[in-house]
Each structure stands twice: as structure tokens, then as C-alpha cells.
Amino acid sequence: MRIVADENIPLLDAFFAGFGEIRRLPGRSIDRAAVADADVLLVRSVTPVTREMLEGSPVRFVGTCTIGTDHLDLAYFQDAAIQWSSAPGCNARGVVDYVLGSLLTLAEIEGVDLRQRTYGVVGAGQVGGRLIAVLKALGWKVLVCDPPRQSAEGGDFVSLDEILQRCDVISLHTPLDKSGQSPTWHLLDEARLRQLRQGAWLINASRGAVVDNRALHDVMLEREDLQAVLDVWEGEPQVNVALADLCVIGTPHIAGYSLDGRQRGTAQIYQALCTFLDQPAAISLADLLPTPWLAQVSLDAATDPQWALNMLCRGVYDPRRDDADFRRSLTGDTASQRLAFDALRKHYPPRREIEGLKVHLEGESDTLTQLIRALGAVRV
């Protein structure tokens, strides 16, 4: 079996060497010629997989080690009887850690109490749903907008306009869809961006084009009260540098780049390929993940809960380092910036997740116990 794979997919050999020959390529370089003799194609979101790429090739399985599928021509896959799989939820915890770290940074800069803010989550899928659960477990007020789920389930959802009018913090977690009943391309266009309430914080860790980047730049120039955290950008790997300069935090599409999440995505595609080939999965991710450098922390029952929240979250992941690295990359000409964007992702340092962190609590505190549980950590 011949496998063509994005060279940045982790644990390629560990999971796929047993299937046959692996040819590694930069994700943006995978094209029709690269898959001309491939049976299996393994990609990330940077590789558009289209009819033009695959037609006439022997490829019968496509796996993307990401949660999104907007880079896959699923209609063609169905017509051509090509089996495919994504990795839903693989990086959800990493994105939640990113959002929490960003919120704590913003709160520190603005001098506000996160418990007093109203949060609007747009998109309640794998990532958004996880964030909603954590925010509610912390006891914070959350409004949710998800038109597809509202149509299918009913329930306690609100409109996007209500989110814009009522929420101090808006976090976007939608797929990118240019058509259908609920398109998300430029979901936040200039008109909607101008509806943001006074002092609002906008976080986008979904897809760059969910927000009209040019319009956001223009609105932020006019409204100094707004704050933005952007991990995704229209036109990646090119970035609107003028917009990045206006953001409190800017990063190169790494919100979900935890070591756990990236390797989890590879494991999910491995399991899907095993199912496609009708053979048992012989490799477990649990056997491959290294021990985290911060495996356990200790708290006293008298610890201030807000200090504990800050320590647990930013002790595991603090987005300010990624922001600093990103800003240093926004120099030189356009070509240099594009190369630097991809290099930051390719050489991203290992980062673990809060989930599973062991916390020893000396004494009893219902508030701290609830906090530990809300973050997905484990009291020991």
C-alpha cells in the first residue's frame, strides 16, 4: 500500500508504517502528481483535496487529521466511492485551553472579573460544546447560537443578533460554509461587527473567513473599546498585518495544537483506516503519549479560586508566548511572512492539555473541587 501524507502529521510512522510505504510532503505541496500512484492520502486542513487532484488516481481512502472538512470535496468522494474520515473533537480540549488562557490574559489587561461577564458561544459542535460545558461548570453566564442545532433540536438557543447585543465576550467555533441553510462565510461582516456591544471581546479560533478581516480592521480602528483575539486569518498563510497589530492576541492557527490533540487526530484516522481495511487496530495512543512535564500540582483549601484558575490554566498553557513568536514573524516581505507562518506551525513546541492534570487538594473546598472538575483536571 502506498500512502501520501502531510509531513507535519505526528506519529506517522508509529501508526501507519505497518500499512506500507509512506511518502511525506509539505501539506501545501500535495497535488495531483503527488497522488498519481497513492492508495491512501493523509492530510491536514492546509491541503485542499478536490476532484481535480484525485480524479484518475488510485486513492480510495482520504483521512484528514483535523476536525474541519471544508478543505475536502465530499461530494466528489461520494461520487467516486472514496472512503474518507476526519477527526471530530480531536483538538477540542486544546482550543478550550486556548480560549481560557486568552480570557485570563484579557482580564488581566482590562482589570475585569471574568465571573461578571456574559459569554456568547457561536457554534455548539465538538469544540464549542466543550467550551460551553466548561464555562457553565465554572458558573459563568453563557448564551449559545447554533442555527443548525436549533432547527434540529429546539432548545435554549439564541440568535446571533442577540449574542451581539447581550454578550461581553463572543467566541466563534463554527465550520466554514459558503452555502447551505446556515452559511458562515463572513458570518461577522461589517454590519454585524458594528453591532458589538461596548467593550466587547471577540475570539475567533474556528476559520479565518468566518470574520470579514478587512471589515474587522476598519471597525477596530474606529472603536478602541473593542478587543480581539485571532488564531485564524483570511488568506492563510498570509496574514493581514495591520489587523494583527490591533489584536490583543494573535497566533498562527495553533489554538488546537496541543500535543494530545494532534496525536489524537492521527489516532482517529488510524482507527478509521483500520475499519476501512477490515482489520483490528493494534496500536493505542495511550502507549505513545509521553508523560506531561507538569503532571501534578498541589493546592490548599484556602487558595483563592481566581488565583487557582489562573495558575491551573496558564500553568499548562499561556498564549502570550505564541503571540510574541507570531508578532516576530510579521516582518519582511509577503513571501517571508507566509513561510514564517507555516514554520511556526511546523516547529510548534510540545504543549499539553489541562484535562487529566492531577491536582492534590489539601483540605476540603467545594469551590475548588468544582473548579478542578470544571477544567477537566483530576483531584487526587
Swiss-Prot record:
<comment type="function">
    <text>Catalyzes the oxidation of erythronate-4-phosphate to 3-hydroxy-2-oxo-4-phosphonooxybutanoate.</text>
</comment>
<dbReference type="Pfam" id="PF00389">
    <property type="entry name" value="2-Hacid_dh"/>
</dbReference>
<feature type="binding site">
    <location>
        <position position="231"/>
    </location>
    <ligand>
        <name>NAD(+)</name>
    </ligand>
</feature>
<dbReference type="GO" id="GO:0046983">
    <property type="term" value="F:protein dimerization activity"/>
</dbReference>
<comment type="pathway">
    <text>Cofactor biosynthesis; pyridoxine 5'-phosphate biosynthesis; pyridoxine 5'-phosphate from D-erythrose 4-phosphate: step 2/5.</text>
</comment>
<dbReference type="GO" id="GO:0051287">
    <property type="term" value="F:NAD binding"/>
</dbReference>
<dbReference type="Pfam" id="PF11890">
    <property type="entry name" value="DUF3410"/>
</dbReference>
<feature type="binding site">
    <location>
        <begin position="126"/>
        <end position="127"/>
    </location>
    <ligand>
        <name>NAD(+)</name>
    </ligand>
</feature>
<keyword id="KW-0520">NAD</keyword>
<dbReference type="InterPro" id="IPR029753">
    <property type="entry name" value="D-isomer_DH_CS"/>
</dbReference>
<keyword id="KW-0664">Pyridoxine biosynthesis</keyword>
<dbReference type="InterPro" id="IPR006139">
    <property type="entry name" value="D-isomer_2_OHA_DH_cat_dom"/>
</dbReference>
<dbReference type="InterPro" id="IPR038251">
    <property type="entry name" value="PdxB_dimer_sf"/>
</dbReference>
<feature type="binding site">
    <location>
        <position position="45"/>
    </location>
    <ligand>
        <name>substrate</name>
    </ligand>
</feature>
<dbReference type="InterPro" id="IPR024531">
    <property type="entry name" value="Erythronate-4-P_DHase_dimer"/>
</dbReference>
<feature type="binding site">
    <location>
        <position position="257"/>
    </location>
    <ligand>
        <name>substrate</name>
    </ligand>
</feature>
<protein>
    <recommendedName>
        <fullName>Erythronate-4-phosphate dehydrogenase</fullName>
        <ecNumber>1.1.1.290</ecNumber>
    </recommendedName>
</protein>
<feature type="active site">
    <location>
        <position position="207"/>
    </location>
</feature>
<dbReference type="InterPro" id="IPR036291">
    <property type="entry name" value="NAD(P)-bd_dom_sf"/>
</dbReference>
<keyword id="KW-0963">Cytoplasm</keyword>
<keyword id="KW-0560">Oxidoreductase</keyword>
<dbReference type="GO" id="GO:0005737">
    <property type="term" value="C:cytoplasm"/>
</dbReference>
<feature type="binding site">
    <location>
        <position position="256"/>
    </location>
    <ligand>
        <name>NAD(+)</name>
    </ligand>
</feature>
<comment type="similarity">
    <text>Belongs to the D-isomer specific 2-hydroxyacid dehydrogenase family. PdxB subfamily.</text>
</comment>
<feature type="binding site">
    <location>
        <begin position="205"/>
        <end position="207"/>
    </location>
    <ligand>
        <name>NAD(+)</name>
    </ligand>
</feature>
<dbReference type="InterPro" id="IPR020921">
    <property type="entry name" value="Erythronate-4-P_DHase"/>
</dbReference>
<dbReference type="InterPro" id="IPR006140">
    <property type="entry name" value="D-isomer_DH_NAD-bd"/>
</dbReference>
<feature type="binding site">
    <location>
        <position position="146"/>
    </location>
    <ligand>
        <name>NAD(+)</name>
    </ligand>
</feature>
<feature type="active site">
    <location>
        <position position="236"/>
    </location>
</feature>
<feature type="binding site">
    <location>
        <position position="66"/>
    </location>
    <ligand>
        <name>substrate</name>
    </ligand>
</feature>
<dbReference type="GO" id="GO:0033711">
    <property type="term" value="F:4-phosphoerythronate dehydrogenase activity"/>
</dbReference>
<dbReference type="Pfam" id="PF02826">
    <property type="entry name" value="2-Hacid_dh_C"/>
</dbReference>
<comment type="subunit">
    <text>Homodimer.</text>
</comment>
<feature type="binding site">
    <location>
        <position position="174"/>
    </location>
    <ligand>
        <name>NAD(+)</name>
    </ligand>
</feature>
<dbReference type="InterPro" id="IPR050418">
    <property type="entry name" value="D-iso_2-hydroxyacid_DH_PdxB"/>
</dbReference>
<dbReference type="GO" id="GO:0008615">
    <property type="term" value="P:pyridoxine biosynthetic process"/>
</dbReference>
<feature type="active site" description="Proton donor">
    <location>
        <position position="253"/>
    </location>
</feature>
